Curated annotation (Swiss-Prot):
InterPro entries: Fxna-like_M28_dom, M28_fam, Peptidase_M28, PFF1_C, PFF1_TM. The keyword Membrane applies. This is Vacuolar membrane protease. Residues 1-56, 419-423, 487-502, 557-620, 680-683 are cytoplasmic. It comes from Meyerozyma guilliermondii (strain ATCC 6260 / CBS 566 / DSM 6381 / JCM 1539 / NBRC 10279 / NRRL Y-324). Glycans are attached at residues 146, 173, 446, 461, 738, 797, 877. Residues 25-35 have a biased composition (Basic and acidic residues). Belongs to the peptidase M28 family. Residues 1-12 have a biased composition (Polar residues). GO terms for biological process: proteolysis.
Amino acid sequence: MTTADSNSSATRGSHEMADGSNRVPNDEPYHRKSPESCENANFFVRAMRASFGYRKTSLTILVFLSVIATVLLSYYDSSLEFSVSLPTDKSESKILDHSWDVLQEIARDEHTYASEANDRVHDYLEDIIGFLVDKKSYMEYDNDLNNTHSFLRQTAPSTVTYYESNNLIVRINGSDPELPALLLSAHYDSVPSSFGVTDDGMGIASLIGILNYFSAKQTSQPARTIIINFNNNEEFGLYGALAFLSHPWFKQIKYFLNLEGTGAGGKAILFRGTDYGFAKYFKNVRFPYASSLFQQAFSARLVHSETDYKYYAELGHLRGLDLAFFRPRDMYHTAKDNIANVNKKSLWHMLSSTIDFTNGVVGGEIDLDVEAKQKEAAAFTSIFNYFFVVPMTFVFGVNVLLMVLVPLVSLISLALIFAHRKWSVSLVTFFKFPLSFILSIFLLDNFSSWFVVSVNNFLPNSSAGIIALTYFSFFVLANYLLLNGINLLFWKFKGTRHDEKLVVILQISFMFWVSLIWSTANIAKSQFNGEHSGEFLLTLLYILQAAGGVFGLLCWLFKRSRTVHTNNQELEPLLEHAVEEGYGAHVEQEGHISSSASSAISVNVIESPPPTKHYSYDWSIQFLFIVPISSFLSYNYGWLILEGLKKTLQESATSEYLVFRALKLLAVVVAVPYLPFIFKVNRIVFLVTIFLFVYGLGAIVISEPFTEANPLKLRFLQTIDLDNSPKSNLVSASGRANSSIAEILRDLPSVKESETEVVCNAKADGMTICNYEGLNPHLAPGTKNAQDLLSVKVLSNSSSSINYPFGMLSGKFEIRAEKNRECRLSFREDTGGKRSSGVVKTVVVYKNDLKNSNKVNAMKAPEGFSQDDYGNFVYKNMTGISDLKLNKLDWNRPYRIGVEWVASLDDSDTQPTLKVSVDCYWAEIGQIAEKGKIVDRIPAYTELLHYSPNYVTWANLDQGLVNVKKSVLV
């Protein structure tokens, strides 16, 4: 052996590992440079490496910054205080002040349709409207009190409604009569249990503000005509809007903006729009707040309420928008919807949005006037007072492009990487994240069901944030422990040339891709009608996730290589910074090797050793692509929809289930962007997450679901049944099961004094209703007892008809309800103990004296609505009418009703009779003079308001607070 050979063998031996491989041991220097060479590196380079290298400290700082920024920016975006400013212009300030005064006067007391306070509000608004209209010659006013806009029509299957309208309608005639008009609409009635500040006093006050604005001297005549509908009785059937469809002015209208309130204060949100063509004009609003997530929620019936938008869009075929307050729902329709719980900024947000939007549409011709564009649903949102809207066809097109382009680029990149870069991914690396993700969701679901729901199922009502935080912490911890546990257990099978971060990014991108396919298919299936308009968020999240994945693959593909010389002059290309561990690998061993060296070095090994530090900075670009924006979007819009839904858990067990599903989904979606980096986070993140989880557990156990700020919402109805002997007088309180209703009722003074029994019965969908004998109401002056409140007199009995069994049976009756506006009739055939519905084919509402009215022949009357020679309203439906709802304006006029019906043929010798059940409703709250004393009209309701705990609010269970029942046979 020559000396050279001996030296070569010695050198080779010094680099031979115990397993016979030719790797350089970690404790032996690889470069010829001295260890001090890195120490003498430029200070700036070292600072950059320390700050932006893929280190635990750098990553941890970015994680904390992202979480904090997500929460703070979302709070700013939804905050009325920070995102909306009061007007500085004197004229606008004056308009706001006047509108606020109007709101205070409207909300002085409860003013449902069946109350004298409703008349007071009507007359008050009429005075203001008359004063403002007189300021401009091109303004005019019409009042439906002339009874020309009453209707009798089918409003539900087998239900017919009679309604007398007293809408207040203003027309601001435009300078160009050829332009179709814009309708602005709000309703001035409230429910019996609410002062109606947000629902819909703010809408009415905003319309008064619009009138103030256009009647001002400095405001010129608009080019487009504006019609304003101050409508009544929206709460129990949208009847004011329905009546307006038959008004002569309605024919001019093509567009509308409806102002509503389904919460109590806060910011007014654009939550529905008929189409993109009209929704895009909301960009003119100075403080836009919008989300088509609510549009999708309404389409899916996740929110159990409706607005006038429904009739304007569906029956009126108008193009328009729905702008409404939406939180908190537990104060909605209760006495807490009052002036004390709102402020001027809330009113200004709706008022300024109405002014800005109206000016943007009425200033001149818009593209929808001249182009017969098809209505195309829109996806829209707002961020920091910037409004974004796109048609659903655009969302569909982008989705299709992404579904094709991203997989194509990714697959080509992967093929090139595996072919030339030798990126090896072991089965453990490939399967551990999907396994961890699925198992974590399974564990989260069981944790939610077996702990959170069982311990405090109503907690989202007051502390949805605590639950979301606990779920988020649990999900992150589960993935952290599972992923690192798998790495620990299967460390021998862990590949050496891989990037765990990139693998997880690609797998999450694939999950979003599958979800995008599902969403796109649904969009196409719904024919782009907006049922899935909230899913544009999925498109944005996929773009961000895919961008991080594609960027990582391209970095792998185009990574610069360095060459290492062997002793026989062979060249070995190596990936810079990541040889054994691969691109982006997270190695942090201490040593003296500089992975940033770029020159070729002559060594006597075939493979280079693993780098001791990873100074690649492209990870930070991936992080910025994926985490901050995705985290903000997921949290901001997830929390927004949760704010609108969380209080609905008081309405049914189904809603409770949906709320907890939304909480789990929010936690998972917000956590997903952080999961690719979970391998690298500092132990501080782990400890903080544990602390948050433990804190959440404690809070879930001890927190109260119902507080004064987040009350328990119960519903009230007092029912007096005159058919019973003696009459029954039951108070019914309805709410969620296991929500302490019985305990609240048993503590009432009247219940304890009379030793009345409180009986509770379970109802469908997790609800319960409790009944007890209540205090007698005093509903009308001069009535001595309940029998004086309601009487039904049969004027023409069908039993005397000679047409049976081959012809129509008919009957007439008169209902006298003292000081009343609302009744409901139910028709059932009564034959030998058998009862059937749908036998009535024609109903007649007599407007004049019965003596001057002829019998209506059902064979001659047309199907649907008609009027006879005396102006009586006739409705015929041969499929059957089961219910007739009556709404009149005259407090003292009796209801005079005629029916024609067909009896069923059976073997009974008894001639059939028609049972008519009459339910009349009273809703007036306050006091009344009776026998020289001032007494409460509905003392049972007043007692509940006074003696219920401060964490309880009361709403009406039906269209009135007191229901008096009586039935007759016709």
